[in-house]
Design a protein with these regions (language model features):
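N-terminal secretory signal peptides
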Residues: 1-18, 29-32
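N-terminal twin-arginine translocation
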Residues: 17-25, 31-45
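Short, low-complexity cationic-aromatic patches
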Residues: 47-51, 63-65, 90-92, 104-107, ...
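Vicinal oxygen chelate
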Residues: 62-66, 108-109, 113-149, 155, ...
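Short, charged/polar, Gly/Pro-enriched secondary-structure boundary elements
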Residues: 96-100, 107, 148-151, 157-160, ...
Length: 292
């Protein structure tokens, strides 16, 4: 943190103002000083984030309609979407959500993840991060050394904080099927990132989330309220990426859900955890369902 210091002795006498302009300048400075002091006191509290946890993540896919149908049938048949083109769906996963947008010719991927922040002050955060050499882009997105993007979002900015009428106007809803969802989602459980160099990446994540809660041979884990963020070393030869997400769901029959996933076009994957069911959706995105 850069600190400005005066070179003059603090014991030097104050010069007497010689004009109305100087008197006005002194009055303005006196009025502003409490605000500046308060800002300086607040700035250390901006980081690590005071977060209520991971709130949503976004994916970019080849066909938004197809992906919306898949995730709507899996988690929540009633989707919301942006009122204006391009098509962008939002799928509820219990208290959290998935944002689905078009990849526009790029490979399908999880594009970003979002931490919801208490008492968030965007302008102050932008200035604070600038001192760390970080730039906050559109919609509060900031990238780690590999370009993996974290979205900073205040609780008051979240769509879930809007009154029902305002939300319906901003994001009209559409029901894609009369059938119930394959599983009953509760909330996002974790998001896992694969980075090219763990030690290079760690200062970024510690800046935002504080000390890790656990470290093992594969990487580190941060506990963010009731959610977890895994920052692991990418296997040799594989690119850095947001690798997968896991949703806590109500207890389910594994064979029944596996059969329904296959019917929807998913590809099942192995897992060492009996409480988890791993699969890849039709865009190749890795998804985990965990029985809560």
């Amino acid at each position: 943190m850069k600190i400005c210091r005066h070179s003059e002795s603090t014991d030097a006498p104050l010069a007497s103002p010689t004009s109305r302009r100087e008197l006005l300048q002194l009055a303005v400075a006196a009025a502003c000083w409490p605000l500046l002091a308060a800002a300086q006191e607040r700035s250390p509290e901006l980081l690590p984030l005071r977060t209520t946890g991971l709130q949503h993540f976004g994916m970019q896919v080849a066909d938004v309609e197809v992906a919306g149908q898949f995730y709507g049938r899996l988690f929540s048949p009633t989707l919301t979407k942006e009122a204006e083109p391009p098509l962008r769906y939002y799928v509820k996963i219990g208290s959290d959500s998935i944002a689905i947008g078009g990849a526009n010719g790029r490979a399908s991927r999880i594009d970003h993840y979002c931490a919801l922040i208490e008492e968030y002050h965007p302008a102050a955060m932008i200035e604070r991060l600038r001192t760390e050499g970080l730039t906050v882009g559109n919609q509060g997105l900031v990238g780690d050394p590999d370009g993996l993007r974290l979205q900073l979002l205040g609780m008051s900015e979240s769509a879930s904080s809007l009154p029902a009428e305002a939300l319906a106007s901003r994001r009209p809803s559409v029901r894609i099927t009369d059938e119930g969802p394959v599983v009953t989602p509760i909330a996002l459980e974790r998001v896992v990132l694969l980075v090219s160099d763990l030690e290079r990446a760690l200062p970024f994540y510690r800046l935002f989330f504080g000390a890790e809660s656990r470290r093992d041979a594969d990487g580190v884990w941060f506990q963010l309220a009731d959610t977890r963020l895994g920052v692991l070393t990418a296997p040799s030869g594989e690119p850095p990426r947001i690798d997968h997400y896991c949703v806590n769901v109500a207890p389910f029959d594994r064979d029944t859900v596996a059969a329904k996933l296959t019917a929807l076009g998913a590809t099942l994957a192995g897992s060492d955890d009996a409480d988890e069911l791993h699969f890849k959706d039709s865009d190749g995105i890795h998804v985990v369902l965990r029985a809560a």
